């Protein structure tokens, strides 16, 4: 099981605004800012997002290779997948595939996929057998 993921973004303020909008339908919020000076030498400043008291998705400013990561966010139902996709598109995402069944994985696998402003692949996913 994963505990957290860091991604590097080219414009931290733009990315915070994007993720605040895109993740809101999933009840994932910008939860904490971490000052790198509080960590070991060379630790980056971080902007953390999470839900239910757990921070698990972190942004850091830097040089980007946006196609190097794919992140899937859990939705609690089909309406949340649809809402997250719509929010991400309204916030400037680029479409990879609109919401729908991903039959190549499983007929019950419902998801949408977008690219964030840095080109990262984001998936909003609902798997009814995992809820």
Where are these regions (language model features)?
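N-terminal beta-strand motif that seeds the catalytic metal site of vicinal oxygen chelate
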Residues: 1-16, 71, 128-131
């Amino acid at each position: 099981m994963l505990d957290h993921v860091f991604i590097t973004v080219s414009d931290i303020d733009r990315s915070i605004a994007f993720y605040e909008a895109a993740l809101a339908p999933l009840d994932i919020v910008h939860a904490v800012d971490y000052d790198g000076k509080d960590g070991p030498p060379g630790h980056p400043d971080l902007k953390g997002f999470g839900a239910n008291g757990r921070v698990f998705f972190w942004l850091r400013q830097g040089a980007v290779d946006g196609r190097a990561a794919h992140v899937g966010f859990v939705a609690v139902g089909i309406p949340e997948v649809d809402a997250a996709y719509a929010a991400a598109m309204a916030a400037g995402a680029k479409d990879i595939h609109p919401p729908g069944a991903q039959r190549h994985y499983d007929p019950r696998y419902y998801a949408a996929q977008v690219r964030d402003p840095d080109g990262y692949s984001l998936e909003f996913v609902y798997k009814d057998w995992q809820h």
